[in-house]
Amino acid sequence: MSTGGPQKLEAQGGKEGKEWDDGAEHDGVTKIYVAAGGLGIEQIRFDYVKNGQPKEGSFHGVKGRSTISTIEISHPAEYLISMEGWYDSTNIIQGIQFKSNKHTSQYFGYEFLGDGTQFSLQVNDNKIISFHGFADSHLNSVGAYFAPISSSLTTTPNKVEAQGGNGGETFDDGVFDHVRKVYVGQGESGVAYVKFEYEKDGKRETRDHGKMTLLGTEEFEVDSDDYITSIEVSVDKVFGYNSEIVTALVFKTSKGTTSPPFGMVTEKKFELKDGNGGKLAGFHGKASDVLYALGAYFAPSTTSTTPSTTKKLQARGGNGGASWDDGVFDGVRKILVGQGNDGVAFVTFEYNKGSQAILGDGHGKKTLLGTETFELDYPSEYITSVEGYYDKIFGVEAEVVTSLMFKTNKRTSQPFGMTAGEHFELKEDGYKVVGFHGKAGDLVHQIGVHIVPIFTNYRVAI
């Protein structure tokens, strides 16, 4: 291994076509364009940053009638660490997938089913800074240049001082990748309790502080493609406490969403915000039986590598239960639906991410009636629409989902539940379902979907 400069990994695939080389003088990759067609990957292009300046790359291959999909990488906090794929006897790249230090892209082209040659471009403790290969009418091969991951890429989060009083015990949740949900519980005089749902390396973690009262909690959920940019903290001196306490919280996001005020807004307000436009990454402060003070960590904002064509269709049903969101995957493998006496009591979904089958969390509550399963012939089969009904049932304040039915590119499932009430359909022509979200308590109150364009082709043995 050379230590004097970038390391060049040999191109994988066929050597047909014209050799291309984007050069090894870049700092990193900022954008990827991929067109996948009937015979494999038709065309690819990479944009770079060089000496801090953006540099557009060239297209390699020829795009037919396929759609170009893009991946954006937020340099320098995010960088590519690997590219995986495969090619067959035609010596054309059939499928590829990219991984960064923060995300894994959707799979482009045909997924590997065992007939062909797989490859992986990766060097430990290095990042991809450029690509090379061969291409003609299609992408025949691809290789990469690697450089060590500079310590300068590791940015120190900005810790914004806690605002409020001096009472209570100090807490510090630390720094996470995302803040997904905030729960705020009121007391008689101010904010008595907070709970934060974080995400780090794809896993959810919660931290709570203060003491919950009989008033319960209110919640503010952040969409998967959004993040909190500021928190307004109201504080006041309240009878019975030796120092000021937090009386209200208001959250604002990068997409312009503002939460309702959680608590009593006062004239004395502070704003927790990063001067560099960063995103909220964690909380610290002081609490005991109430929240005395709140501060925050902010980290550089990053752009998700989920293709920008991903859409989130609004959930349908009643406004009950707690919000949930499984996020975006490559596809759906299996659906389990559990019935209750009056509606859908429980759902869980098995997804595919890269080469892994991932079982999502259960939503709702299983009953003695058990669950029914709808299994897809993944990857050649995918969900194109979700239909169902929701209705008001005795003893439950908000409407519940009473029936679900799933349509794929090959067939339609049986109806799970009772087809009564208000009908709905979650569908967009030319798109497939790659994730679910909704609301649930003891029953499923709402169901919604994440969708992406159907541009991936799957090879099926005949």
Swiss-Prot record:
Classification via PROSITE patterns: JACALIN_LECTIN
Superkingdom to which the source organism belongs: Eukaryota
Pfam family, one: Jacalin
Keywords carried by this UniProt record: Lectin, Repeat
Induction: Up-regulated by methyl jasmonate.
Region (Disordered): 1-23
Gene Ontology, cellular component aspect: nucleus; plant-type vacuole
Record GO biological process: defense response
Annotated protein name in UniProt: Myrosinase-binding protein 1
Organism: Arabidopsis thaliana
